[in-house]
Amino acid sequence: MSTYLIGDVHGCYDELIALLKQVDFTPGQDTLWLTGDLVARGPGSLDVLRFVKSLGDSVRLVLGNHDLHLLAVFAGISRNKPKDRITPLLEAHDVDELINWLRRQPLLQIDEEKKLVMAHAGITPQWDLQTAKECARDVEAVLASDSYPFFLDAMYGDMPNNWSPELSGVARLRFVTNAFTRMRYCFPNGQLDMYCKDTPENAPSPLKPWFAIPGPVTNEYSVVFGHWASLEGKGTPENIYALDTGCCWGGDMTCLRWEDKAYFIQPSNRQLDLGEGEAAAS
């Protein structure tokens, strides 16, 4: 039994299947972890959702910002942008079933035995693991409820950007969503910066990548995340694994086999344009 962790799929169904064949992934024996952003940009979002859903207990995933945006488009809150290439999904006969499955997926995955944590954008250094669990449950409960469209309508925005246990209501849910699905940079005190999307060497002072600021979770656990394609999987501490390597922008789809830390790469079927990716991603 092996554990395979794969970065953002973004509708790149053919590359996902090729990568799983490359590692001889066997559902029922192996477990697949996915860093979120299953949909948008690539041509096969519908096939990706159908396939991942079919894996049942053999897959563990987290929601990304593009997955949440899909839910908002489905609910009539956000506009369907042609560049996301999700129209075939929205028009599919089983779209209701797929959406209801997707909105019941978590924001956080934890394996205590492996001391492994996964979230789409990472874990803010302002949280310990118990706080992260509680915050994830808050958003997950709303997404799984009948009132999820009201949350999706209120989730867009960059404030508040500083964690406090006193946060409540929409402000709390928005901070949690941004921390789990959109975060890249923090100020030295852990406060989120939601504007900078440059690579770390070009980021203005005093901003630092979230993983460069010591926090309770990263001090005790390994953390796997996606979201940040321009990192190209590089520049993180030894126990932090950046797995989004920009497949939908012409980069690669990356898989990490946890047991021996072996990497496997599947080249994209698209022409390389990582600059396009970071400019377009939220």
Curated annotation (Swiss-Prot):
<dbReference type="InterPro" id="IPR004617">
    <property type="entry name" value="ApaH"/>
</dbReference>
<comment type="function">
    <text>Hydrolyzes diadenosine 5',5'''-P1,P4-tetraphosphate to yield ADP.</text>
</comment>
<dbReference type="Pfam" id="PF00149">
    <property type="entry name" value="Metallophos"/>
</dbReference>
<dbReference type="GO" id="GO:0008803">
    <property type="term" value="F:bis(5'-nucleosyl)-tetraphosphatase (symmetrical) activity"/>
</dbReference>
<dbReference type="InterPro" id="IPR029052">
    <property type="entry name" value="Metallo-depent_PP-like"/>
</dbReference>
<comment type="similarity">
    <text>Belongs to the Ap4A hydrolase family.</text>
</comment>
<dbReference type="InterPro" id="IPR004843">
    <property type="entry name" value="Calcineurin-like_PHP_ApaH"/>
</dbReference>
<keyword id="KW-0378">Hydrolase</keyword>
<protein>
    <recommendedName>
        <fullName>Bis(5'-nucleosyl)-tetraphosphatase, symmetrical</fullName>
        <ecNumber>3.6.1.41</ecNumber>
    </recommendedName>
</protein>
